[in-house]
Amino acid sequence: GGDAPGLAFETLDWLHKKEVAAIVTDTWGAEVRPNETEDTNQPWHWIAIPIMGLTVGEIFDLGGLSKACAEDGVYEFMFCAPALPITGAVGSPVNPYAVK
């Protein structure tokens, strides 16, 4: 835990309007920490995942992908992160990969 950069609660409206299906971050939580409100813990998650159906990946090591994109100047790729097929689960380890 602890403080971390991340998305503000206000980004939810933008993500929804742009029909973003999934996001990944290199931090332990996709939303900014500490919480923007003391009313609830991780309010961004409470809306993004169960209400919007947004798929969220956290603690991704994006260094290699970032370096490869910077080297060739191409920032488009197919990204896949298949999860374990666990009925009723809300989270799973993944095996992510990017194909440039």
State each model region's role:
Residues G1-K100:
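Active-/binding-site microenvironments in catalytic and ligand-binding cores
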